[in-house]
Amino acid sequence: MPKANPTRKTKATRETGGRKKKDPNAPKRGLSAYMFFANDNRDKVREENPGISFGQVGKMLGEKWKSLSDKERKPYEDKAAADKKRYEDEKAAYKAGEAEEDEESS
């Protein structure tokens, strides 16, 4: 028996913008431990492998990340935890400010 086709968005749905526009004032999400690692090591990987494609850089960073010990990952995980807290604090302040604006406009 063939699989049922998943429902597809019609052209009309895409044109009307099924997704909400992101508020430019909203806080940026916190980075993961891997993203902190990748940001710190991306230039080094490019220097060691000149002419490497963007995709290959990502693969090499992923392999390096997987080979790190827990002790080597710890500083990046600490940065990620701090960034997550920053995001949650900024998000709470943003939501509180948004709620105040709603009350004032009512």
Curated annotation (Swiss-Prot):
Q: Which SUPFAM superfamilies match?
A: HMG-box (SSF47095)
Against InterPro entries, the record matches this protein to: HMG_box_dom, HMG_box_dom_sf, HMGB
Which residue ranges does the Swiss-Prot or TrEMBL entry mark as DNA-binding? 27-95
Which ranges are annotated Basic residues under compositional bias?
A: 1-11
GO CC aspect terms: chromosome; nucleus
Q: Does the keyword Transcription apply?
A: yes
Q: Which residues cross the membrane?
A: none
Disulphide-bonded residues: none
GO MF terms on file? DNA binding
Protein's job: DNA-binding protein that induces severe bending of DNA. Required for DNA-binding by the FACT complex, a general chromatin factor that acts to reorganize nucleosomes. The FACT complex is involved in multiple processes that require DNA as a template such as mRNA elongation, DNA replication and DNA repair. Also augments the fidelity of transcription by RNA polymerase III independently of any role in the FACT complex.
Family recorded in the similarity comment? Belongs to the NHP6 family.
Spell out the protein name for this chain: Non-histone chromosomal protein 6
Which species does this protein come from? Emericella nidulans (strain FGSC A4 / ATCC 38163 / CBS 112.46 / NRRL 194 / M139) (Aspergillus nidulans)
